[in-house]
Curated annotation (Swiss-Prot):
Belongs to the JADE family. A zinc finger (C2HC pre-PHD-type) spans 254-288. This is Protein Jade-3. Keywords: Metal-binding, Repeat, Zinc, Zinc-finger. A zinc finger (PHD-type) spans 202-252, 312-368. Residues 801-810 have a biased composition (Basic residues). The keyword Nuclease does not apply. The gene is jade3. Component of the HBO1 complex. One of its GO terms (molecular function) is zinc ion binding. InterPro entries: Enhancer_polycomb-like_N (IPR019542), EPHD (IPR034732), Histone_Mod_Regulator (IPR050701), JADE3_PHD (IPR039550), Zinc_finger_PHD-type_CS (IPR019786), Znf_FYVE_PHD (IPR011011), Znf_PHD (IPR001965), Znf_PHD-finger (IPR019787).
Length: 817
């Protein structure tokens, strides 16, 4: 027999690998999975007890020094266990053989120096280099004006006896003219040729705004953008021989400063290399710093700038772009950009502290003017205007004027001979095209006909970078969306699995219940529960229990006395039958009544009246004739006799239960009233036949009583209705006497205090019994018969007049007993 073991936390893992615990490892040693070839035992097993022993429950108190805590997430594949050898003899033995080393063959290789390609075609056929093809294509396209002029030019050349010019030749000539003009103009600007401007000694550094220089800290000019910086201010460790270019000019970029709205100047990049900022802006903004002071790059801690500084608006340029600084005067909050302050000649001081710390002081336009006024008052009055050196603004305007003149004389920068030599065209043809190019450009306000190639490349590179970042963000969002979809799919899958397991469980329960019902039907036994309650679950009912006043002591004291004072005319026959029967018949009739009351009370829980039909079917299986026990209504004759007073006193409870069941559901059909009226005329012969049938079915009732556990008292309590409810739905047929009203008032008060009133929803909660529980079964039977008589008064007035005297005698005899 297989040894039982406790389940560990790792046993619940869903894996298909063979596993075993420490206790079953040696017991089932060799029971691993076998190979398909030789059927041998596996040489290894997976032990999960090591994983279980390693785990510590959360509720266990262990010294932190005695265990290690995993910081990473526990993986499900770890639950499969540890692979350990179980059958060492089944471990395959390796086999090998020594192979002699094969001698290497020397193959002939052709030297590369003897391989030459005489053609310019690519080595791979069908391969086309897109970049080379783009370079070979002409960038200029002729428009309608060019085509019209070309036609007129060809007519002139034909008259002169020269070869005509085709469209491609004219496009290439115009492209070469534009390219040479652009290159020569840039060279003139960079080398100051044609500008005729010589820088004087008052030029200042673009970073520190100081015109002084010293040994080892010379001022260096960029040969392209013409900015002037100190070596220490820009981080130039060694001045190169020849030309020098700043960082932006080396890369051929014209970036925008992230700290101010200005472009150009001494700029350095951030760590990413995609954002640029002025060195002066990085020095004057307190949150920003420079990583390497020797090289003055890269610019860091831009993210440390608070949002309040980004939200400041410059008082000089009125722009909210970038980050502004504020006036150093404590009472002044004027904001301005660093570069705007330099342009407006605001006072910007750099103070060296005693601890070799550099402090930056900046003043707004108002406070700078005050300081300038104080300084001008302290200056000597004999200062003359002998110093005629131009200011910085004058130099800037002079430079702009020279550049404008250079743009107007653009045609002087191109030589026709060089263009003709480069293209291999006759001078006359190139001269015609040169004249047309000059006139067309003059008519367009000296603007170039082609965009410079460098600008096109910059324009292509920047959108490409932007598109790359956009695609990266798009893919990131797409991945997040896919992750959300995956989680949703997992949750939906898990929900459907739970629903499937729940449905399978209900199906199994239904099949088992059907199997039990079939077994009971096949064995001829009565059903242990209602079929509709077994197979179909009713919705839950909500019952409101109301607190009623406690019963008075006087009512409880006289409740046993007045129980038998009143009885209906139908009870006379019942009393006579009771005295005429033996004790055995009375006991069997009581069992029969309890059996039926149990069915009726169970059926009331579902708000249905199908229990009577099921009781009828059980009596059909006993083998009696239908003609002797059934009417056209389908009810047993014994039930009709009990309802209308033809049975014993113990059967009188069935009458009350049937009426309470019908009224609790709020339905009392006309068929039931007709059957009750017709059954009241039962002959004495039928009564004797019913008594014999009840005596013969005692064994059947005893077998049925084993299937029910509810007592007679519980069934009675579930079927009792309040007297006030019954009294409200009926009208008395006659005026009672004073004595009868006095006796009938007491049970109504007692029942009202014991049973709370509620709506007729087919459900009645258990009632709290008063002192009447100590009464005998006989008095209870009479009380139920009395209530039934009040609830169902006799409709036959003739019969009521005949047996009125007998009713009084029966009432007095009940009181005496």
């Amino acid at each position: 027999m297989k040894r039982l073991r406790n389940l560990s936390s790792s046993d619940s893992s869903d894996n298909e690998s063979p596993s075993t615990s420490f206790s079953s490892c040696f017991q089932h040693k060799g029971k691993g999975k076998c190979t398909a070839d030789d059927g041998k035992k596996s040489a290894e097993v997976f032990r999960k007890d090591l994983i279980s022993a390693m785990k510590i429950p959360d509720s266990q108190h262990v010294n932190p020094e005695e265990y290690y805590q995993f910081a990473d997430t526990w993986k499900q594949e770890w639950e499969k266990g540890v692979q350990v050898p179980s059958n060492p003899e089944n471990i395959p033995q390796p086999s090998l053989r020594v192979i002699a080393e094969k001698a290497k063959e020397v193959l002939f290789t052709r030297p590369r120096k003897y391989i030459h390609c005489s053609s310019q075609e690519p080595a791979e056929p069908g391969y086309i280099n897109i970049l080379e093809l783009a370079e070979s294509m002409c960038r200029y396209d002729l428009d309608d004006l060019d085509l019209y002029w070309l036609g007129e030019c060809n007519l002139e050349l034909a008259d002169m006896g020269c070869a005509p010019v085709d469209e491609s030749t004219m496009e290439k000539t115009l492209e070469v003219l534009e390219r040479q003009c652009h290159e020569n103009m840039n060279h003139a600007i960079e080398t100051e040729e044609g500008l005729g401007i010589e820088y004087d000694e008052d030029v200042i550094c673009d970073v520190c705004r100081s015109p002084d220089s010293e040994e080892g800290n010379d001022m260096v000019f960029c040969d392209r953008c013409n900015i002037c910086v100190h070596q220490a201010c820009y981080g130039i460790l060694k001045v190169p021989e020849g030309s020098w270019l700043c960082r932006t000019c080396v890369l051929g970029l014209h970036p925008q400063c992230i700290l101010c709205p200005k472009t150009g100047g001494a700029m350095k990049a951030t760590r990413t290399g995609t954002k640029w900022a002025h060195v002066s802006c990085a020095l004057w903004i307190p949150e920003v710093s420079i990583a390497c002071p020797e090289r003055m790059e890269p610019i860091t801690k831009v993210s440390h700038i608070p949002p309040s500084r980004w939200a400041l608006v410059c008082s000089l340029c009125k722009l909210k772009t970038g980050a502004c600084i504020q006036c150093s005067v404590k009472s002044c909050i004027t904001a301005f950009h660093v570069t705007c302050a330099f342009e407006h000649s605001l006072e910007m001081k750099t103070i060296l502290d005693e601890g070799d710390e550099v402090k930056f002081k900046s003043y707004c336009l108002k406070h700078s003017k005050n300081k300038h006024g104080l300084i001008s008052e302290q200056e000597e009055p004999h200062k003359t205007h002998s110093d005629n050196r131009p200011t910085e603004s004058e130099r800037t305007s002079l430079r702009a004027q020279k550049l404008k003149e250079l743009e107007e004389d653009f045609y002087t920068l191109v030589k026709v001979e060089d263009v003709a030599a480069e293209l291999g065209l006759p001078m006359l043809t190139v001269d015609f095209i040169y004249s047309f190019w000059k006139l067309k450009r003059k008519s367009n306000f000296n603007k170039p006909l082609l965009t410079p190639k460098e600008d096109e490349q910059n324009g292509l590179v920047q959108p490409k970078e932007d598109s790359i970042h956009t695609r990266m963000r798009m893919f990131m969002h797409l991945r997040q969306d896919l992750e959300r979809v995956r989680n949703l799919c997992y949750m939906v899958n898990r929900r459907e699995k739970l629903k499937l397991s729940h449905s399978k469980m209900h199906e199994e329960i239904f099949n088992l219940q059907v199997q039990l019902v079939n077994q009971e039907v096949a064995a001829g036994q009565p059903l242990s529960n209602a079929l509709e309650n077994t197979l179909f679950y009713p919705p839950p009912r909500i019952t409101l229990k109301l607190k009623m006043p406690k019963p008075r002591t006087r009512d409880c004291r006289i409740s046993s006395v007045k129980a038998g004072t009143m009885s209906s005319p139908d009870n006379q026959n019942s009393s006579a039958t009771y005295h005429g029967m033996g004790g055995e018949v009375h006991r069997q009739s009581s069992e029969h009544t309890k059996l039926y009351s149990t069915y009726a009370s169970e059926q009331r829980n579902n708000g249905l009246l199908g229990g009577i039909t099921r009781f009828h079917k059980e009596f059909q299986g006993t083998g009696c004739k239908p003609s002797s026990r059934f009417r056209s209504s389908g009810k047993p004759m014994s039930l009709q006799a009990v309802i209308h007073g033809q049975s014993s006193n113990g059967s009188g409870k069935v009458q009350h239960e049937h009426v309470s069941l019908a009224r609790a559901n709020g339905v009392l059909s006309s068929g039931d009233r007709t059957q009750r009226d017709s059954s009241s005329q039962t002959s004495p012969g039928q009564n004797s036949e019913i008594i014999c049938h009840i005596a013969g079915q005692s064994t059947f009732r005893k077998a049925n009583m084993e299937h029910f556990s509810r007592s007679f008292k519980e069934a009675t309590n579930n079927l009792v209705r309040t007297t006030e409810d019954l009294r409200s739905s009926e009208k008395p047929q006659r005026r009672q006497s004073v004595k009868e009203r006095l006796w009938s008032k007491q049970p109504a008060d007692t029942q009202t205090s014991g049973t709370p009133y509620q709506d007729n929803d087919g459900y009645c909660p258990d009632l709290e019994l008063s002192d009447s529980e100590a009464e005998s079964d006989e008095n209870k039977d009479h009380m139920l018969l009395r209530r039934n008589s009040r609830e169902s008064p006799n409709r036959d007035s003739c019969r009521n007049s005949r047996i009125r005297g007998k009713r009084k005698m029966t009432s007095h005899s009940s009181v005496q007993r």
